[in-house]
Amino acid sequence: KKEYYIKYYNEKKYLIESDILKNIIKVSKNKEMKIIFPYDDYKKIIKEDVLSEKFPQCYKYLKAVKKELLKRDKGKTENYESWYAYGRKQGLKIDSNKYHLVVSKMLEPDFNVIEIHGEKDFLLLSGYTFECDTKENLELIKKEILKKDFFNYVRQSSKPWSGKKEYYSFSVKNINNYKIKY
């Protein structure tokens, strides 16, 4: 028996086959969600004819939102593998045999840190991932980035986001330039 998730679009109900969904982590919100994943186990796009045959309900939904999908990247989607392909693929290349520390890019208002290991269906929507071979290395990195010294370093080396309160985000460059004190 097939399982389905329900998705609404323009007040119409669509069924989405659960086999085409993956778990995705949005670390900035410390939230796990489901996402349509039109790729095979090797992260290759599922061809449209195969998609429509194997996942007909999901395909109906994707066809319904096609105009919106084609507006992504200011309409410059001609280099996408297919009209339903993801524009960015950084979060698709996760090695489930490694230890991962996923952190939000913003120090405030909530700096979220999530540890992950052995989850085959793990995808990343936002944040940075530290990938380690051992749990010990992961714990060392976690300990360092949670220190007040790291937070102070980011505040000194980054520009704040404007708003009611200044929020600081950090980049890969900040991480690479951070000196660990032993």
Residue positions per predicted region:
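Polybasic, glycine- and aromatic-enriched phosphate-binding surface used to engage nucleic acids
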Residues: 1-182
